[in-house]
């Protein structure tokens, strides 16, 4: 019996396919996944940066540094994403917060970053 899930959009299907290829080690697919989602990553990071600029400044991070960290979040999300978990961008949002926490507070932290 099929679950009542909303139908995937073309963008979600593209993200899922590119993430699967990137997880299998396809560097070109990872680059394409980054290009397709770069605008989303920048918007998410800018929202965080506007609210938490003092945190970023104290860690010595500019907005462009955070965008570079965003690439690592895309890589992490691609390697750990499963289509059963929902949309790739939702998973990527959590990966971005994880990467921000790592970049601003270090590898092992229990701090709350909003």
Feature locations, PLM:
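Alpha-helical promoter-recognition and RNA polymerase-docking modules of transcription initiation factors
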Residues: 1-110
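Short, intrinsically disordered, charge-balanced linker/junction segments flanking boundaries
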Residues: 112-114
């Amino acid at each position: 019996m099929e679950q009542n899930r909303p139908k995937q959009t073309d963008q979600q299907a593209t993200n899922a396919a590119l993430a699967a290829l990137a997880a299998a080690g396809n560097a070109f697919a990872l680059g394409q996944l980054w290009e397709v989602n770069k605008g989303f990553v920048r918007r998410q990071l800018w929202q965080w940066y506007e609210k938490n600029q003092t945190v970023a400044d104290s860690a010595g991070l500019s907005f462009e540094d955070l965008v570079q960290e965003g690439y690592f979040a895309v890589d992490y999300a691609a390697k750990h994403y499963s289509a059963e978990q929902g949309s790739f961008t939702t998973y990527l949002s959590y990966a971005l917060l994880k990467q921000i926490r790592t970049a601003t507070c270090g590898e092992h932290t229990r701090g709350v970053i909003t």
